[in-house]
Amino acid sequence: YGGIVPEVASREHLRVIIPVIQEALEEANCSLDDLEAIAATRGPGLTGALLVGYNTGKAIALSKKLPFLGVNHLEGHVRANWLVEETPPSFPALALVVSGGHTDLVFMEEDGKYERLGGTLDDAAGEAFDKVGRLLGLPFPGGPAVAKEALKGAVSSLKLPRSWLPGTANFSFSGLKTAVLHSIRKDSWSPEEIAWEFQESVVDVLAGKVEKFATELQAKEVLVAGGVASNQRLREELKSRITVPVRIPPPSLCTDNAAMIGAAASPRLSRGERTSLSEDVFSTNDWSVV
């Protein structure tokens, strides 16, 4: 389809949800009777797909009389950073959540406390990668395809815009996407050159914003999360620019996964928190729901 069709995605979730659960239990060498709690993504995201996983989780919790926790998908991405190092992050911390659907800058004064400083006003960074990949005739998903194409490129005469939005923690990538389209139509640069400069523009803005706010807020650590955090160029630039420790999960934990949802649910379970089975999914970006 060249992208995600919500109805198709929902039906595919429904088709594979039980086999995936069975496979996970087999790989972990356990059964549902060994579990102490159930956690499931509550949002944000595509409602049809969310409902499949969320309601399956609620059904298992109800049938096994287990505690249930609905998890904010974006918090899950941040908590993936707890899975890779023995020592927890230092606070206050600044988190960059950058994915196909979201690009948020979040301040964490303490563990579990989230303040969204800003986010994208239009396309998310990952969405921009996908759309530019499509413009360049690359396969979906565009993120890894554009990054691979950029490896063939180098500095050229092409200069794409950087949308800094001074004085804010917000991002905007729609203008950059339009500039790429105009560059393609001019037919003066190769796909590799365009991919390289596009990636440089995105990485420059993301790293620049993180550098600015990490300094201003005196963050002791920077946490990076989301599918775009798999981008090697972004990982290198953040670690090069930021003077405090930068945590980035391995690529396998940057893209959507269940481990990060468990990581987000675990401390809440320890605090005795529970999600009512009457609570529903949510589709919009809301950091107050954690």
Briefly describe each language-model feature range:
Residues 41-43, 60, 99, 223-231:
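Glycine-rich beta-strand-to-loop/alpha-helix junction loops that act as flexible
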Residues 31, 147-222, 231-241, 269-272, ...:
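A contiguous, well-structured pocket-lining segment that forms one wall/lid of small-molecule binding clefts
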Residues 70-71, 222, 238-261:
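Conserved phosphate-binding/catalytic loops in two-lobed NTP-binding clefts
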Residues 110-152, 177-178, 182-188:
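Glycine-rich phosphate-binding loop plus the immediately following alpha-helix
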Residues 71-93, 264:
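Conserved phosphate-binding catalytic cores of ATP/NTP-utilizing and phosphoryl-transfer enzymes
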Residues 1-44, 73, 77:
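N-terminal beta-alpha supersecondary unit
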Residues 77-79, 249-289:
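Glycine-rich phosphate-binding/hydrolytic loop that grips phosphoryl groups
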Residues 95-97, 103-107:
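Short beta-strand scaffold segments in enzyme catalytic cores
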